[in-house]
Each structure stands twice: as structure tokens, then as C-alpha cells.
């Protein structure tokens, strides 16, 4: 009888017959344990996603507290984006080595300590340091890309849908946390709110983190970790017939391009409505409408990607996002903008999760944590770049027309990369395979 280790090196190892482990592994994939883990990932992702949104809400209060100008007060947000980007890559690599449990525990602890430290900051530098290092780089970063990579190990038939559900946690965080933070700030001030959030997050997230203690099923049989069904014209060592780093760079560049385009409505819709004379409140309603339909789109696109693969899902989403951006150029009426905003949310929600699906389809599974994190980090950087770039274009032209056209140009670049990769791809979409005992 052949034996294999469980692969868990944190809480002890034990040997069991490989055939039994193989059977248990197949029972876990797409099974009850997988769906429970997905639910836990959605919940902890929603909680941990606060690190990306809270700094925006407290920015005016921080500016007033420390007596700095708006540019200096915006520094913590910029450092948050940089910290998140750097942290995602390192946390992804750590996840590939030891699994997601330890990164998630580290994230829960860092978020709690980070918010307490931010609430006790004596100056803007200390606040920015706590925000960038503890809250973003160590705290929130393992709760998006690395968490999605972990979820991908637990699903085969429903992998695309599962990845979309996991990614939705970031949307839920953006919907739920800002009004909660604002409510407590009104009554208790920003410092007490930050400290309270830190204590709350540690108390709630640490027990949740232990739901990820169990290693992913495929990690239990070492021979199966990287096993995939190969076709004669598909070589995972050369995705799309390119070097792995070149293929990764193209996917990352596509992520930047799509999100520069995506950022135009998401970041500037409120200001756009104000400039058109509709008021800030109408713009905020359109943003909420956009995010709500984005959740629907994200889930639906996950189901679609299970049927046609991540690349084709990206192609469809990119094309439809371009259509919605063009509609923004054509229509400027209030009712029309409500409709276009709903369509934009419905069209673009599935683009970001498709990158995680593409990575799992075309790269070795053992690299999932790192490569998924790089791809998703690129989308975050694209949002940051687009938000700034479209603002610069508005300042230059005194109109958002050129900014929308700029978004269309970046969207065309994303669409071109998707078409190029589809043309390079050969054979059926790969799927994770098991190794017979």
C-alpha cells in the first residue's frame, strides 16, 4: 500500500493510505466542505476589504485633525494602494508555499493592530504608515488574491462561479463599510472609530481564520498538486505559446487597461453628475446602482466562465464594457445616465474574476497564489491610474468627454490583448486532474 502525507506542516503530519486520501480529496472538491469554505471566504473577504475603503471615509477628518492640505491628506490613500500591491505579491507567494491559513491569520492580526495604531497616530506620517503597512500590505492583501487562489483549489466544475463569489466580497466591503464608518464617526470621532474597528476585526476575523486551517484537497497528494490534463498542443510551461513571465505580463497589462477604462464611471460618476447639474446625490445613486448590478454581473459571469472559460468571458466583458462607455459619450440626460450606469455595472462585473480563472486554466496550479495575486493587483493599480489620469484629462479639457474617450482607448487595448491570447490559445480549456492511486 502506498502512503502520502497530508501536507499540513503547522499542526502535525500523519500518513494515510494514498487511495483513501485520493477518495477523500475527490469528495471535497465541489463538495459540502468546498461550499462552506467559499462562504467563509466571502465573509472574511467582506470584513477584510475594509482596508481598501476606510481611508477614503476618514480622509477629511484626518486632514482637519493634522492641519494638512488635501494633497498631503491624500498620501495615506496612495500609500495604501502601493502597500496593497506589494503585499498581494508577497502574500501570494507565501500562500503558494504554506497554504492560505497563516496569511489569513496574519491579515486578521495586522488589520486589528493597524486600526488601533491608526487611531492612536500622533501625526500624518504615523497614520499613513499604519494604513500602508499593517492595514493594506499585511492586513487586506491576503484577503483578496490569495484567498481567491485558495478557493480555486476547492472547485473544479464550479470554479468560475466560486471565484466570482469570492471576489464579490470586495464589492460588499465597498457597499457596507463606508456608511458604517461614517455613522460611528459622527458620534464618536474618527480615532475611536478606528480603534473600535481594530478590536472588532480581531475578535471576529481570528476565529473565522481557523476555518481555513485545513489544507486544500489537492495539496494532500503531492503528485496531484500540479497534475492537469494536457492536450497535445497545450503546454502549461509555455502558456499561450509564450514564456510564463511574458504571458503573465500580458494578463497584468490587460488588467491595468480594463480598469483604467472601468475607473472613469466608477471614480468620476458623482463629479460628472454634479458638473451636468444633476447634483451629487444623483451621482451617488448611480454609483450604488452600478455596484449593485456589478454584483449580479460578477456572479453571472462566474457561471458563464464555467461554461466557456475565462478568456472568452474576458472578451465578452471587455466588449460590453466598451459599449457601455460609448453610451456614456452619447447620452447625458438624467434618466439615460441611470440606465447606462445600470448597464455598465451589469457589463463589467465579471471582468476582474476572469483573470483569476485564466491563471488557473493556463498556468501550473502550484503558482496560483502568486500569479492570481499579480493579476488582481494589476487591476487595482489600473483603477488607481485611471482615477488620476481621467481627473488630469478633465482638468486639461474642462470636460469629461475626452476622459470617456480615453477610457474607450484603454478598453480597446484590453480587448486587443484578449483577442491576441485567444488566437494564441490552442486546444480545449485545461482542467485539474486527479492522479489515480
Question: Where are the predicted features?
Answer:
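Structural signature of the two symmetry-related core transmembrane helices
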Residues: 102-116, 312-327
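Interfacial helix-cap and linker-helix signal at transmembrane-aqueous boundaries
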Residues: 62-63, 94-95, 179-188, 273-274, ...
Amino acid at each position: 500500500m502506498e502512503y502520502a502525507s497530508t501536507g499540513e506542516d503547522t499542526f502535525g503530519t500523519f500518513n494515510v493510505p494514498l487511495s483513501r486520501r485520493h477518495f477523500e480529496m475527490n469528495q471535497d472538491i465541489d463538495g459540502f466542505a468546498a461550499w462552506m469554505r467559499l462562504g467563509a471566504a466571502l465573509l472574511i473577504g467582506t470584513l477584510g476589504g475594509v482596508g481598501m475603503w476606510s481611508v477614503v471615509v476618514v480622509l477629511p477628518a484626518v486632514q482637519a485633525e493634522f492641519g494638512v492640505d488635501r494633497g498631503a491628506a491624500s498620501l495615506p490613500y496612495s500609500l495604501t494602494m502601493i502597500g496593497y500591491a506589494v503585499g498581494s505579491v508577497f502574500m501570494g507567494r507565501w500562500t503558494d508555499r504554506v497554504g492560505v491559513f497563516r496569511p489569513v491569520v496574519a491579515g486578521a492580526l495586522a488589520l486589528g493592530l493597524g486600526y488601533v495604531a491608526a487611531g492612536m497616530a500622533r501625526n500624518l506620517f504615523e497614520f499613513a504608515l499604519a494604513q500602508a503597512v499593517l492595514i493594506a500590505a499585511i492586513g487586506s492583501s491576503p484577503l483578496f488574491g490569495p484567498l481567491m487562489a485558495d478557493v480555486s483549489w476547492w472547485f473544479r466544475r464550479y470554479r468560475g462561479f466560486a471565484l466570482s463569489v469570492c471576489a464579490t466580497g470586495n464589492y460588499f466591503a465597498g457597499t457596507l463599510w463606508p456608511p458604517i464608518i461614517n455613522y460611528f464617526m459622527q458620534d464618536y470621532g474618527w480615532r475611536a472609530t478606528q480603534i473600535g474597528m481594530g478590536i472588532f476585526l480581531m475578535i471576529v476575523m481570528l476565529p473565522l481564520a481557523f476555518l481555513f486551517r485545513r489544507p486544500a484537497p489537492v495539496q494532500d497528494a503531492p503528485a496531484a498538486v500540479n497534475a492537469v490534463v494536457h492536450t497535445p498542443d497545450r503546454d502549461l510551461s509555455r502558456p499561450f505559446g509564450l514564456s510564463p513571465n511574458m504571458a503573465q505580463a500580458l494578463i497584468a497589462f490587460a488588467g491595468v487597461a480594463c480598469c483604467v477604462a472601468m475607473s472613469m464611471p466608477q471614480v468620476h460618476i458623482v463629479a460628472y453628475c454634479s458638473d451636468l447639474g444633476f447634483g451629487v446625490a444623483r451621482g451617488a445613486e448611480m454609483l450604488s446602482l452600478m455596484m449593485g448590478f456589478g454584483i449580479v454581473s460578477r456572479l453571472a459571469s462566474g457561471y458563464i466562465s464555467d461554461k466557456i472559460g475565462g478568456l472568452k468571458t474576458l472578451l465578452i466583458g471587455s466588449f460590453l464594457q466598451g459599449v457601455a462607455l460609448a453610451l456614456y459619450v452619447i447620452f447625458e440626460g438624467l434618466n439615460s445616465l441611470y440606465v447606462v450606469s445600470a448597464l455598465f455595472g451589469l457589463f463589467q462585473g465579471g471582468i476582474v474574476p476572469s483573470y483569476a480563472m485564466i491563471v488557473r486554466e493556463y498556468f501550473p496550479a502550484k503558482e496560483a497564489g502568486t500569479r492570481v495575486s499579480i493579476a488582481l493587483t494589476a487591476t487595482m493599480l489600473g483603477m488607481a491610474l485611471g482615477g488620476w489620469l481621467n481627473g488630469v484629462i478633465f482638468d486639461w479639457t474642462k470636460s469629461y468627454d475626452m476622459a470617456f474617450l480615453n477610457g474607450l482607448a484603454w478598453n480597446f487595448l484590453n480587448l486587443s490583448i484578449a483577442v491576441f491570447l485567444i488566437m494564441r490559445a490552442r486546444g480545449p480549456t485545461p482542467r485539474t486532474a486527479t492522479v489515480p492511486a
